[in-house]
Amino acid sequence: MFREKVELKELEQMDPEYRDLLTRVVTIQADCEIGGPHLYAKDILPSAPTKTDQLLVARTASEELDHYRKIARVAGDFGVDVSFVLSWTNQERYLEAFRGTINTWEDFAVFGFLIDRVGRYQLEEFFGCSYQPLTDILPIIIKEEIGHVGYGESKTAELAAKGEESREKVQAALDRWYVKALDMFGRSDSTRDQRYIYWGLKRRTNAQARQEFIREVDPLIGKLGLRVPDPIQGRQYL
């Protein structure tokens, strides 16, 4: 198990596998950060029910863009240009959760509640990771991501409490996004995640992180008076 800390100036001397895995993980993370605003900003921002909601949507999108910039800067410092993801269509995104569009507030709220929560899990993998420049940018990013999750959770609760029709719409959104959230963790039998762990770039296997997410989010869904969706039906990666 690799336990050293790697600074930018030392990266060229690292094993090619380490550099390849680092390149992959920052590229996917950059795509995830930009993917969210591409999904919802066009339709959700102008349809916000209140000025406060509109402000919070705008701030969320702005912070996600800044997260992309921070990740892109880390990548650029070691010669990797991730700017190509800026011009990708949604259907070209690395992860299924960022393909398509979001044009209802039920979907937007549940996206924040679930998908941004997975984003927090993804970022937590890098806490104390072997590549120091990546660790260094995490505190503010994770703090803001927690805010996005909190807003999504509060809006989900608000919409679920508005009446039967609204609760049914929230449940339908939950059914759509829950399996996408679980799939974001990747395959349980992945061999690549073992290499990430070996090189100190991640702390948990895909299966471990997914189970921790389930243990956290399922009770929250129940507290909202909603039904926990089937964790298998519709999944792409088990």
List each language-model region with its residue ranges:
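A contiguous pocket-lining binding segment that forms or flanks enzyme active sites
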Residues: 130-186
